[in-house]
Regions:
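Generic structural signal for well-ordered, non-membrane alpha-helical segments
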Residues: 10, 14, 105, 153-156, ...
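Generic secondary-structure signature for well-ordered alpha-helical cores
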Residues: 22-26, 165-173, 183-186, 213, ...
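Glycine-rich beta-alpha junction loops
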Residues: 38-41, 126-127, 154-156, 180-187, ...
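Catalytic core of tubulin tyrosine ligase-like
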Residues: 170-234, 240
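C-terminal active-site/capping subdomain that shapes the small-molecule cofactor and substrate pocket
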Residues: 232, 244-337
Length: 337
């Protein structure tokens, strides 16, 4: 029997999760039965059909009353600000995909459980109280059926951690700094407006904007042995999608470009296939749009200085890759003991 899912928040990630479900491999195992979003059903249906970044949805989408019908599947659309009043119990929802960016702690996300859902998967870094922070492909084995609220980390953490896992296991990482060159998102502004972060107050369309990110520090939540050893920052850039992780670290022993590239290539074709991909072509960001991998390593950019100072780089579709991992984590959790 398919897992019944409700999506709370039908923005960039919520919509891409739905599209990824219908375009991908989990269609028979997962069934979206409801969407909670403050937009009306007609607008949400239109935004499902047509997408500036990912193109037209090649399926049938129409509205019937208070429902959006996708390829014959009826999905109820509600607009409720208070998650405790959502119809999860009535609809028999097993899992809620919390995609608003607002209910990121266990305390807040548990409002969905009060409304009748069994479990909540947060599409953002979670608070200290969540049961687990998961990067699928690296630590999804820690999921337990007893968990009620889990974080799927961030798109950037999902790009970085698979690289870190391979490099730490094969070579050893003493300490590292990450920079993500990140496409702008809708929490930025089109024109200059007031913001407590003076750089974030500036137009996303005109500048490269340095800002903070918790993605690097979150590595320690997934790989506790590296807690406190990796930090980083972000530079938001005027592109609409696809981002880039630039990770520099001190290796525990001497290594070479060939060894590092070989280790990543082996993992991308083996244990991390589908999560970590390998590229040796001179590509640019648009070439990775709509790529479902969490992380596509760019072997052309690897640098090693004096054997122990190492730089590696990886591309990621910060929308599509992460949305696919939400589905992967959901399915893995549903099967956990």
């Amino acid at each position: 029997m398919a897992i019944k899912v409700g999506i709370n928040g039908y923005g960039r990630i919520g919509r891409n999760i739905l599209r990824a479900l219908y375009e991908g491999k989990h269609g028979g195992a997962i069934k979206i039965v409801a969407i909670n979003d403050l937009g009306d059903a007609n607008t949400n249906a239109h935004l499902t059909r047509y997408d500036t970044v990912h193109g037209r949805f090649h399926g049938d989408v129409h509205v019937d009353g208070d429902s959006m019908v996708v390829n014959g599947d009826r999905i109820r659309v509600v607009a409720q600000r208070d998650p405790t009043k959502l119809p999860w119990a009535e609809l028999g929802v097993d899992f809620v995909l919390e995609c608003t960016g607002l209910f990121t702690s266990k305390a807040k996300a548990s409002a969905h459980i009060a409304a009748g859902a069994k479990k909540v998967l947060i599409s953002a870094p979670g608070g200290d109280d969540v049961d687990a922070t998961i990067v699928y492909g690296v630590n999804h084995g820690v999921l337990k059926s007893s968990h009620s609220v889990v974080s799927n980390a961030s798109c950037t953490t999902n790009c970085l951690v698979p690289l870190v896992k391979v490099l730490h296991e094969k070579i050893g990482i003493l300490a590292g700094v990450m920079n993500t060159v990140h496409s702008y998102t809708n929490d930025q502004v089109l024109t200059d407006v007031y913001h407590s972060d003076l750089r974030r107050a500036r137009s996303a369309t005109m500048s490269m904007i340095p800002t903070k990110t918790g993605a690097a520090a979150a590595v320690g939540l997934v790989m506790p042995e590296l807690k406190g050893k990796i930090d980083g920052f972000s530079i938001r850039v005027p592109t609409i999608n696809v981002s880039f992780v630039d990770f520099t670290f001190t290796a525990a022993r001497k290594t070479t470009v060939d060894e590092i590239n070989g280790a990543i290539k082996a993992a991308a074709g083996g244990a991390l296939k589908g999560i970590l991909a390998y590229n040796d072509q001179p590509l640019v960001s648009v070439d990775f749009n709509h790529d479902p991998a969490s992380s596509t390593y760019d072997a052309t950019l690897t640098k090693v200085i004096e054997g122990t100072l190492v730089k590696v780089c990886s591309w990621y579709d910060n929308e599509w890759g992460f949305s696919n991992r939400m589905l992967d984590t959901l399915l893995a959790w549903s099967k956990a003991a």
